[in-house]
């Protein structure tokens, strides 16, 4: 894997505003930290998902997790993992009013990631990692599939700019608790957070400071959350288990690496751009 650009690239940041042109590198970095980051100014090319995807070499052996009807990468070196077959994905897309031809023609691996026995230069997922009931085991499984030096390319929702805004950030303790429990389904807490505490999902409104009205129907929402939790053995209910911002994600991954739970380290981490509800990261297998 090529060396990713830094979190703050002074040249990229200076190019966003002629008023910044005279700043040297140190001053540009300081200015971004003091002003640009909170405004969502792009300070690195890989802050944008399209550039993150372009950074993955076309000749790299790649596994994309959860493509559904919009695979991010296509080509002879790309394989897909999903919980549904290609035919099931097309049927689901049709029911949702989505063109089924947008789905991949073939899903190479149907079910869990643990079934895969080959290795890859890169693994890619978008808005997937936050759904994993056991984050540590997921990262361990991805690490197992990566060749030494390979990268896990991630597009992750930033909880500040999506419907998770009012839900507290995830903690290291919570991540390790899930690992110790070998959690495979979402908890009652995750159900309550999703059905009771979520708000609108318009990132521009969130960037402007409009996070929605105070939730007034919590009683009915809570009753619904309990009902959905009771049905969890009948069908899989998909909610977020984890709520990240770039600093929180960095701290959790770094600590998991430090204590030996994973062999992945952060090779690149990029703050969200204005109007978007996601940030990008690259984890690299170190051994």
Regions found by a protein language model. Name each.
Residues 1-50:
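Charge-rich, low-complexity intrinsically disordered regions
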Residues 3, 122-133, 238-243, 270:
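Short, charged/polar micro-motifs that form catalytic or ligand-binding hotspots
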Residues 6, 25, 74, 237-239, ...:
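Short, solvent-exposed coil/turn segments
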Residues 45, 60-165, 281-285:
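Conserved SAM-binding loop
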Residues 47-59:
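N-terminal module-boundary/linker segments of secreted carbohydrate-active enzymes
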Residues 53-54, 119-121, 195:
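N-terminal/domain-start segments enriched in small and hydrophobic, helix-friendly residues
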Residues 100-102, 106-113, 137, 141-143, ...:
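S-adenosyl-L-methionine-dependent methyltransferase catalytic module, highlighting the catalytic core
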């Amino acid at each position: 894997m090529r060396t990713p650009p830094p979190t703050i690239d002074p040249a990229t940041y200076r190019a966003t505003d002629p008023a910044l042109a005279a700043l040297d590198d140190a001053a540009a970095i300081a200015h971004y930290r003091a002003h640009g980051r909170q405004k969502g100014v792009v300070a690195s090319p890989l802050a944008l998902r399209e550039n993150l995807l372009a950074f993955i070499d076309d000749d790299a052996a790649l596994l994309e997790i959860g493509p559904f009807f919009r695979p991010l990468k296509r080509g002879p070196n790309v394989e897909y993992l999903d919980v549904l077959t290609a035919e099931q994905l097309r049927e689901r897309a049709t029911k949702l009013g989505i063109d089924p031809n947008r789905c991949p023609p073939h899903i190479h691996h149907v079910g869990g990631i643990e079934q895969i026995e080959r290795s890859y230069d890169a693994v890619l997922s978008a808005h997937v990692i936050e759904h994993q009931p056991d984050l540590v085991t997921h990262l361990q499984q991805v690490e197992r599939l990566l060749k030494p030096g390979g990268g896990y390319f991630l597009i992750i929702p930033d909880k500040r700019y999506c419907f998770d805004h009012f839900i507290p950030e995830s903690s290291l303790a919570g991540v390790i608790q899930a690992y110790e429990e070998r959690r495979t389904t979402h908890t009652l807490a995750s159900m309550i957070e999703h059905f009771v505490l979520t708000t609108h999902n318009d990132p521009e409104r969130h960037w402007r400071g409009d996070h929605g009205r105070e939730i007034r129907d919590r009683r009915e929402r809570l009753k619904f959350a309990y009902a959905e939790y009771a049905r969890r053995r009948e069908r899989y209910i998909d909610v977020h288990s984890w709520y990240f911002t770039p600093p929180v994600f960095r701290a959790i991954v770094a600590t998991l690496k430090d204590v030996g739970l994973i062999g992945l380290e952060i090779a690149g981490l990029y703050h969200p751009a204005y109007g978007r509800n996601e940030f990008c990261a690259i984890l690299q297998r170190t051994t």
